[in-house]
């Protein structure tokens, strides 16, 4: 099984098997910006491509590293249009990849208060976490999990029903600011944009956002809406569960726009 091990090289957890290349989501131009939504990486969905997948994760890190440095961005939100597109795996592996850089301190936050998933990824069952910092007065230092020398993890202990109200409190803004001051990079795994509003609150508190899109998963109108909701913080997309041959093409020139049949 793919996952994190302190004694081994970090490994990317693959997404479910990919559909055919022609089933990749359509292209989409955003009305709010003349720029295309550029795919900063394309991750394969087949387990046999795990070496290639990890290389693509490093490609993602390299491209993001340049963007973050040039724009002085320290907090990055990772989300998706709907559940099941692989945003938690991308967030976790991205944080691990950045933490491999020399003298780079990284914090990974489980910001999906309704359906926290990072605990299962790391095999960690938290008794307290983000929601306790926001509602019960817990100190950040008391709930942080130290994964290795350069990577810390802020868990969410349990699903929280009234998450929007909790995230809207000023304490969340303060917590993000405190984390940005103490780490070189803060990666926030957030809830999917549809059908809840949590991420619309969180995206206002971070410097940048990354949209994970699983090939053939979310309907075109929802992906378009998700991209628009993340503006102006959206800096790119990660294509997940793409066939290896297709990913070599789409990682360089993929963008969103209507299918030819949509124009009929």
List the predicted regions and their residue ranges.
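Long, basic/Gly/Ser/Thr-rich N-terminal segments
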Residues: 1-37
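P-loop/Walker-type NTP enzyme "switch/lid" segment
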Residues: 30-62, 66-69, 81-85, 104-184, ...
């Amino acid at each position: 099984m793919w996952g994190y091990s302190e004694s081994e090289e970090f490994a990317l957890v693959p997404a479910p098997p990919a559909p055919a290349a022609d089933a990749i989501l359509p292209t989409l131009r955003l009305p709010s910006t003349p720029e295309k939504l550029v795919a900063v990486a394309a991750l394969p969905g087949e387990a046999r491509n795990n070496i290639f997948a990890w290389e693509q994760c490093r490609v993602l890190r390299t491209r993001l590293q340049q963007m973050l440095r040039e724009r002085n961005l320290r907090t990055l939100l990772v989300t998706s249009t709907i559940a099941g597109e692989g945003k938690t795996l991308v967030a976790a592996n991205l944080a691990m990849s950045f933490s491999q850089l020399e003298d780079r301190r990284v914090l990974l936050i489980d910001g999906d208060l309704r359906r926290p998933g990072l605990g299962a990824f790391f095999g960690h069952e938290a008794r307290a976490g983000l929601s306790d910092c926001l509602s019960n007065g817990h100190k950040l230092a008391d709930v942080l999990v130290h994964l290795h020398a350069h990577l810390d993890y802020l868990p969410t202990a349990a699903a929280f029903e009234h998450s929007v109200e909790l995230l809207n409190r000023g304490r969340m803004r303060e917590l993000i600011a405190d984390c940005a001051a103490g780490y070189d990079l803060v990666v926030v795994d957030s809830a999917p944009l549809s059908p809840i509003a949590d991420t619309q609150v969180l995206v206002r508190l971070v410097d940048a956002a990354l949209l994970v899109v699983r090939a053939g998963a979310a309907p075109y109108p929802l992906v378009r809406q998700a991209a628009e909701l993340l503006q102006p913080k959206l800096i790119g997309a990660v294509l997940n569960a793409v066939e290896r041959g297709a990913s070599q093409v789409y990682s360089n020139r993929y963008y969103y726009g209507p299918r030819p049949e949509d124009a009929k």
